[in-house]
UniProtKB/Swiss-Prot annotation:
Purpose: A probable RNA chaperone. Forms a complex with KhpA which binds to cellular RNA and controls its expression. Plays a role in peptidoglycan (PG) homeostasis and cell length regulation.
Pfam families reported in the protein's UniProt record: Jag_N, KH_KhpA-B, R3H
Major place of residence: cytoplasm
Residues annotated with Phosphothreonine modification: 89
Gene3D superfamilies for the chain: 3.30.300.20, probable RNA-binding protein from clostridium symbiosum atcc 14940, R3H-like domain
Name of the molecule in the record: RNA-binding protein KhpB
Jag_N domain: annotated span: 3-52
A cellular-component GO term for this protein: cytoplasm
Location of this chain's protein in the cell: Cytoplasm
Organism: Lactiplantibacillus plantarum (strain ATCC BAA-793 / NCIMB 8826 / WCFS1)
Span of domain R3H: 256-322
Subunit structure: Forms a complex with KhpA.
Length: 322
């Protein structure tokens, strides 16, 4: 049994099926938690599902006897409920064996299409037999898909189309970034750090580089302080209507040096897993750092990576590829 996560229940199931190399009818699904959007980016957590691979012997099989019985029952139901047309009564002196044979043959030929039709109807019914948890999860995945479609439609409706709308959106984003800079400088000042900000601003991104003599205090242990400030900055932009702008905070090229460190960590961890045959849990990381680990080992044919846990304690696991 393995726990998988995703933005929706359906996305979590899809990620699990891809990881396990299984189809939907080969696993049992148990929904552990629904996805929550949170408030202003706080309290948000993904949907969680637990997938259990169903043994091959447990798969339901439809026997020929049961299919034949179902077909015969369907034929009997059709013959009972079908309206009968009145037929004229013809008096004959004697029924010959030839006529009886023809009547019996006609009855048999008429029953064959009905029987085959009943079998054709019964076959999809037997294929639709699945375990209880999977059916329940399918019902829950429909509202998630609908809400995702509505969200995409809402984003498309809010996307500026005319040059005037694009210019207005750009001006609003610049205003939000300026306000964010003032807010961040006030926050770090309370930490005892005097700094300036260099801004690299685009249509959907904003990179803010702190210029200060107290880089270590602003970065924190393993980058925890700068990462917390970055999360706070993203929440600030979301609150000011610029959620589509991705904010990155940097100081003294820390992000570049951290990326190089993570790549070396991924390579050394992969060598350790290959040598020992045991999976290794890395320290908890933010999502953008976990993506660097996944990307670095994606082309390694000996190990595989996946994430476990919930933010902020979600961590990458490196294991032997099966």
């Amino acid at each position: 049994m393995t726990v998988f996560e995703g933005n929706t229940v359906a996305a979590a199931i899809a990620a699990g099926l891809k990881q396990l190399h299984r189809t939907r009818d080969q696993v049992e699904v148990e929904v552990i938690a629904e996805a929550k959007k949170g408030f202003l980016g706080l309290g948000k957590h993904p949907a969680q599902v637990r997938l259990t691979v169903v043994p091959a012997s447990a798969a339901p099989a439809t026997t020929p006897t049961s299919a034949t019985a179902t077909a015969q029952q369907s034929v009997a139901t059709e013959s009972t409920t079908a309206p009968t047309m009145p037929r004229p009564t013809v008096q004959t002196p004697k029924s010959t064996p030839t006529r009886q044979a023809k009547t019996s043959q006609a009855t048999t030929s008429a029953a064959k299409p009905a029987t085959s039709k009943a079998k054709a109807v019964a076959k999809p019914a037997s294929m639709a037999v699945t375990t209880g948890p999977v059916i329940a999860d399918t019902d829950q995945s429909k509202p998630a898909t609908t809400s995702k479609t509505k969200s995409v439609a809402a984003d498309q409706s809010q996307t500026p189309r005319t040059p005037a709308e694009i210019a207005a959106r750009q001006a609003a984003n610049e205003t939000a970034v300026r306000a964010l800079c003032d807010y961040l400088l006030a926050v770090v000042k309370e930490l005892g750090v005097t700094a300036d900000l260099d801004v690299d601003f685009g249509n959907r991104y904003a990179t803010l580089n702190f210029d200060t003599t107290k880089q270590g205090l602003l970065i924190g242990k393993h980058g925890r302080t700068i990462n917390a400030l970055q999360d706070l900055a993203q929440v600030y932009m979301n609150h000011h209507g610029a959620s589509h702008v991705n904010v990155v905070l940097d100081v003294d090229d820390y992000r570049e040096r951290r990326a190089a460190t993570l790549k070396r960590l991924a390579e050394s961890t992969a060598r350790e897993v290959i040598a020992t045959g045991k999976q290794v849990f890395l320290d908890p990381m933010p999502s953008f750092e976990r993506k660097l680990i996944h990307a670095e080992l994606a082309n390694n044919h000996h190990v595989t990576t996946f994430s476990e846990g919930r933010d902020p304690h979600r961590a990458v696991v490196v294991a032997i590829r099966k």
